[in-house]
């Protein structure tokens, strides 16, 4: 009896990684663009950005040019308003019953009272007791006052403990404008009487002279005031 021959087809053993083989790779130049194409793409992007920036700049320039006439018109209107304001300031006048001299208005009271009451009355009129600027202004007031026999308080007072004459704005008396040579007593206030300036007790009853300015000026501009 012939022995049966059995042949087994032997297959080589599979390695562990053989079950997960990677797909075959594509050719190197299958999905790559030529270098010249990439350069053209970059240049196109740069050109597009430059175009957008240029359009934005032109739109801003057009807007400025459109608004320029309006800005110039506003400037002209502002200048006209400033000129009108200047003209109005030049036409300011003193209130009725006030004396006008240079850039000041003066009011002579019709009643008599103490120096302090005169100060309060002037303040209620939006003014102050008279502050003499120079000899010319003093001469104008002396010539304008008809009642030569009366005394009129002004904004000058003898202060303690300084023992000095001071205007109500705090500046000291300038002797080039006014000179008070008499011995001064405590609690003395200055008054215009006749053709000179005298001093009396601040509690005396006198009329007074108020002043206000037509234009805004700082009191430091007055040469009649010391510092």
UniProtKB/Swiss-Prot annotation:
Residues 1-45 are cytoplasmic. A motif (LCK-binding motif) lies at residues 31-34. CDD domains: CLECT_NK_receptors_like. Keywords: Disulfide bond, Lectin, Membrane, Receptor, Signal-anchor, Transmembrane, Transmembrane helix. It is found in: Membrane. The keyword Membrane applies. SMART domains: CLECT. Residues 93-212 form the C-type lectin domain. One of its GO terms (molecular function) is carbohydrate binding. Disulfide bonds join 94-105, 122-210, 189-202. The keyword Transmembrane applies. Homodimer; disulfide-linked. Interacts with tyrosine kinase LCK. Plays a stimulatory role on natural killer (NK) cell cytotoxicity. This is Killer cell lectin-like receptor subfamily B member 1A. The gene is Klrb1a.
